[in-house]
Amino acid sequence: MQKYFVLLLALLLSACNMSRPIPELESVPVTDTPGAEGGYTQCAWTWASQPLPDLTAKVQSALEAAGLKSVAISAEAYGENCITGTGEVDHFAAMETDFRFTVQVASLNDHAALGKMLEQILVILDNFPTGSTPGPNAGYIGVTFQSGIEELRLWFHIADGESAREQGFHGTELLEKLQNQ
C-alpha cells in the first residue's frame, strides 16, 4: 500500500511540473514607465493647513449681516503638502475645510445665550456646505467663547453640528450636546 502511495505522489508531482508553452514576446504588452515629463511628481506627503482668506471674508460678511458683530471667523483648508525630493512644496491637496470662531460674550455662565449664539453660527455655516469649500470631506468647527480672560472651547465635526440640530437640540441643549463631542 505504501508503494502505491509513493507512486501516486510521484505521478502527481511530475504532473505539476509539466512544461508549459512559453508566451511569445509579441503577446506581452509593453508599457511605458511614467516619468516626470508625464506630469507625475513623486511626493512625500505631510499634514498641512492653508488659510482661506476669501472664504473667511465671505463667512465674516454673513455673520455681520446676521447681526453677529462680536464673532470673528478664520477658515482654513486642512490636507497634505506634496514635498518633492528637493524639499520644496509642489502642491497642497485639501481634504477638508475647518472653521474657527471666536465669540466675545458677557458671561460664560449664560448657557442659553451661548447656545443661541452657537445655533446662529451653525445656521450661517449651512450656506457654506461641503462641496462648496475646499476638500471632499466635511471638516471641523471650533468655537471659542471668551468673557474677559475666561474661555469655553468647543471642537466638533460639522456633521455632529448638523445632526444635533436635526435631532431638535437648541439653546442650552445644543451647547451641551456639542460640548461633549
Features from the language model and the residues they span:
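Positively charged n-region of N-terminal signal peptides that target proteins for export
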Residues: 1-4
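Sec-dependent N-terminal signal peptides
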Residues: 6-9
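C-terminal motif of bacterial Sec signal peptides marking the signal peptidase cleavage site
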Residues: 12-15
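Bacterial signal peptide processing site
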Residues: 17-19
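Post-signal peptide N-terminal segment of mature Sec-exported envelope proteins
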Residues: 25-47
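Polar/charged, Gly/Pro-rich intrinsically disordered segments
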Residues: 43, 48, 54-106, 131-181
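Short, non-transmembrane amphipathic alpha-helical segments
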Residues: 111-134
